[in-house]
Amino acid sequence: MEIKVLEKGFIRLVEVMGDDFSAVQAARVSYGKGLTTPERDKKLIFYLMEHGHHSPFEHIIFKFHIKLPIFVMRQLVRHRIASINERSGRYTEFSDEWYIPERIRTPDKVNRQGSVFVDDDDLNSEGIRLIEETIEKTYQAYKRLLEMGVARELARIVLPTSMYTECYWTINARSMMNFLNLRADSHAQYEMQQYALAVAKIFKSKCPVTYEAFLNFAYTGDLLKTEGCL
């Protein structure tokens, strides 16, 4: 399952270990029991979520392959309860792929952590032109340094954080729900929100009961409760 994100990025599910009822099995092992009926298992998942017993959900593991701008990657790695391997800029050359926003945003006067899109055509045109020109110049400087024989690990320091990188990201469902609370929310940066929504879509498709319970009892953000968000 692969979802396109932004204009050149994606998030792809590589593999998943477990499903909704892996949490049920983990919870019931305390009593020497396993699965019962689908109805009772669903009730248990809802009970666990409602009462904050989230450790059984750590037994559901997702592995993703993600292509994303470096500045989004830097936010992703702040979620420490996950395993990450990123493409190396020391051993591989960066291709000419970078993120350009479709529209300019300005600081939100109400939500100080957020930003809002502007309808000013002149600002959009001039802002995007300046972003594109600056990135192109830095990438050409990077290529020139490589041509001069400068090591990749040093030449890359001129590159902007809009460059695309790739990583493998492995995370359990409990940590994923924490990620969604923080990133599938209007306080998060717009570009980060788009990746969080893609993660939520995959989570919902693979663990629909857990996802439903999460939204009902544990989700503290706002985007996932917006109709049509996925």
Curated annotation (Swiss-Prot):
Binds 4 FAD per tetramer. Each FAD binding site is formed by three monomers. Keywords: FAD, Flavoprotein, Methyltransferase, NADP, Nucleotide biosynthesis, Transferase. This is Flavin-dependent thymidylate synthase. Catalyzes the reductive methylation of 2'-deoxyuridine-5'-monophosphate (dUMP) to 2'-deoxythymidine-5'-monophosphate (dTMP) while utilizing 5,10-methylenetetrahydrofolate (mTHF) as the methyl donor, and NADPH and FADH(2) as the reductant. The gene is thyX. A motif (ThyX motif) lies at residues 78-88. One of its GO terms (biological process) is dTTP biosynthetic process. Homotetramer.
